[in-house]
Amino acid sequence: MIRRRRVAITGIGLVTPVGLDAATTWGNLCAGRSGAGTIRSFDASGFATTIGAEVKDFAVPPALRGARVLKFASRAHRFALVAAEQALADAGLRPEAATSHRWGCSVGAGMMVVAFEELQSVHAFCGRDGEFQPDGLLHPEFPADPIAFCRSQTNAGLALLTQHFGIRGYATSVHTACASGGQALGTALKVMRRGHVDFMLAGGYDSMLNPFGLSGFCLLGALSTDNATPERASRPFDATRNGFVLGEGAGFLVLEDWDAARARGARIYAEFAGDGNSLSSYRITDSHPSGDGPIQAMQQALADAGLSPEAVDYVNAHGTSTPMNDRSECAALRAVMGAHADRLAVSSTKSCMGHLIAAAGAVEAAVCVLAIRDGVAPVNANLQDLDPECNVNLVRGESRRLRIRAALSNSLGFGGSNSCLAFRHPDEVGEPGNDGGPR
């Protein structure tokens, strides 16, 4: 009989709008502190939305300042490098020459990284008739940075991380919009179970807080326009919600073989127990109102982890604060959990951090792991007038203390991609066939 490998989470690194590390981020989420404010990184005064959840006071730490890869790194790439460095330090692990081929990296990332200034430079070579004139663009004296082309590749973050940390095993870059970080972690779990590697550095990063990203979401009507009260603008499941707050950041986890982690005396935050992955195939911008896609993802994650719905004590919902998403996700939760939806704790930490797009699933997975560790379900901030169609047991007012045996993290992306990840308390005994036993 085949014994399935158990996977331990032993390191966490976070760079978010509410903290530059995991401890600060977690403390602020539990306190319900908002990271939203008026956008400072560029002039957003001409947009319908002028607020965002920016990473504040960010600087590359001394340990990374001499890194060669910084030459190629965008702001979002730097978030990733810092969060990954934190996760490895937290785990007390680092790829070495002898083990580098047994390390893998799975990264969730967003759109091509093209600086707004670079777009302006290209636009300068459009003639008055709208026809593009390449001669000037290709001239040796053109001021554009040739490194920008390398930096703009969607897998550039993966390349920078693996180069900097010396990872030579399995590597993949996932691009499924808001589900990217979650699906990158799910991929890492599968790779670990198959024995391709012994360690994985997995997570996601993104920053769409620029004129291009803000204009796109404004045109879609997806963002809150509560510019006078940014700290209250993101209010998932509230009857008055009117859109999400755009954020930025990165989150990374270190995964390793459960038995090896215990043998070396590592602190194990949680077992990475299950992964669910589905497609809604409905619209590019939202899920079907029935919640069919998220239902499949949650059912898959529970089955993969060997968990019954009643064994789950906390769900970190995708909860974007948009009218359609919040209702359909609650319908999906009710369909999967049944009467247990009245008991398990549910919250969306986007109420504090905003929507980190490709990084969201990875950061929120880390939130689930910390919730399991501390026995705390973080508050769903700004929830004052509950939408009656969001009839699940939401964490209101303040964070809730409870023993969390298992937790789910939902991420639902543009294009219909859905991710659900299941995490189990390290003291919980898994179901036969799902905890390393025969199946």
Mark where each language-model region is.
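ACP-dependent fatty acid/polyketide chain-elongation machinery
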Residues: 1-69, 91, 109, 259-271, ...
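Active-site pocket-shaping loop/turn-to-helix segments
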Residues: 14-23, 65-85, 111, 145-151, ...
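Active-site-proximal alpha-helical scaffold in enzymes
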Residues: 80-93, 154-158, 162-165, 171-206, ...
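Acyl-CoA/ACP chain-elongation machinery
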Residues: 40, 196-242, 275-289, 319-326, ...
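Condensing-enzyme catalytic core mediating Claisen C-C bond formation in acyl metabolism
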Residues: 6-10, 33, 37-38, 228-305, ...
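Phosphate/pyrophosphate-binding loops at sites that engage ATP/ADP/AMP, CoA/4′-phosphopantetheine
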Residues: 87-99, 261-265, 297-314, 336-340
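Conserved beta-ketoacyl condensing-enzyme motif
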Residues: 9, 22, 27-173, 205-214, ...
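Glycine-/small-residue-rich "gating" segment that lines the acyl/pantetheine channel
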Residues: 126-145, 186, 190, 194, ...
